Amino acid sequence: MKESVIRKLEGLLERNEEVLALLSDASIISDQDRFRALSKEYAQLEDVVKGFKAYQQAVADLETAKEMLEEDDPELKEMAQEEIKSAKASLERLEAELQILLLPKDPNDEANAFVEIRAGAGGDEAAIFAGDLFRMYSRYAETQRWQVEIMSANEGEHGGYKEVIARFSGERVYGKLKFESGGHRVQRVPETESQGRVHTSACTVAVLHEVPEAEAVEINPSELRIDTFRASGAGGQHVNKTDSAIRITHLPTGTVVECQDERSQHKNKARAMSVLVARLQAAEDEKRRSAEATTRRNLVGSGDRSERIRTYNFPQGRVSDHRINLTLYRLNEVMEGDLNALIEPIVQEHQADLLAALADEQG
């Protein structure tokens, strides 16, 4: 391992010991904000410290085994050769793991997320598929022990959603869902199709990280147009008699957010504002990413419908991720929320891209 990397790891080990000492300090324990921040830092350091200690142990084992080679006893020599082989394999594995642990972290990975699903081409069938996607993400959320809260929903006339926006909250929500942004295409025979022909329809998914109030982009109230209207259900019928639904338009960008899920106008406005802030922040993030990564592919999609990331083929029971040429014949399990088989490979691919970029920077 490079000397510069070793020095960085030694610095993290020292910092870990400092944080541990601070966490037992009475003045820190009484300051809840400081205690919480240090506890979070300690948790973030835990894996890399554990990995580096294992690496140091493997280095020590290798040195001990090399010393054993100097012995005259043939049995000891043979044992030493086995130890050397084992220690070298451990060092190789631990070095690869530590490189990944040292990669720059996306600070938003720990954030909650808004998931926006919109029916695209395909009419009723696209709306039904949008409903299927929402169910798939909700089932996945159950396996992760996340909470799901619908912020806004525009139901399709024959089921599903023309558009649904939901807030997913829990541990590492954005970090796990951020690669879901983009165009999702479905190929299947609709229930209304008498000839048994396969139809293709599409939905777009956009995953936006929730922005804490302290970090929110500043929005000038004069740049907002706020309209109230009566909430409507599937087929357009009005579901309540008061104008509790809210539509907020951000005039400089033309961004529009509607929220009509709550009966309280105040609650709908608060929800719509949180989604608007997330969208404006996502636009800023996208601009920054484009400027930073012109030479590097970006696996985190923008939610653009032209950017097709995945195809769900029901007749063949197949799901394909076009970004990494991955095809799985386990569509039923995926639609029931078993998404790790799709999420983990793309996270690994993203890490490989980051490692390659880091190697280029280091020359």
From Swiss-Prot:
Region: Disordered, residue numbers? 286-305
Provide the alphabetized UniProt keywords. Cytoplasm, Methylation, Protein biosynthesis
UniProt cross-references to InterPro entries, sorted A to Z: PCRF, Pep_chain_release_fac_I, Pep_chain_release_fac_I_sf, Prokaryotic/Mito_RF, RF-1
> Primary place of residence?
cytoplasm
Q: Which Gene3D superfamilies match?
A: 3.30.160.20, 3.30.70.1660, 6.10.140.1950
- Which pairs are disulfide-linked? none
Q: Where is the composition biased (Basic and acidic residues)?
A: 286-295
Question: What processing steps or modifications follow its translation?
Answer: Methylated by PrmC. Methylation increases the termination efficiency of RF1.
Q: Which GO terms describe its molecular function?
A: translation release factor activity, codon specific
GO cellular component labels: cytoplasm
Q: Which Pfam families match?
A: PCRF (PF03462), RF-1 (PF00472)
Q: Where in the cell is it found?
A: Cytoplasm
Source taxon at top rank: Bacteria
Q: Point out residues bearing the modification N5-methylglutamine.
A: Q237
Similarity comment: family membership: Belongs to the prokaryotic/mitochondrial release factor family.
Protein's job:
Peptide chain release factor 1 directs the termination of translation in response to the peptide chain termination codons UAG and UAA.
Q: What is this protein called?
A: Peptide chain release factor 1
Q: Which organism is it from?
A: Shewanella amazonensis (strain ATCC BAA-1098 / SB2B)
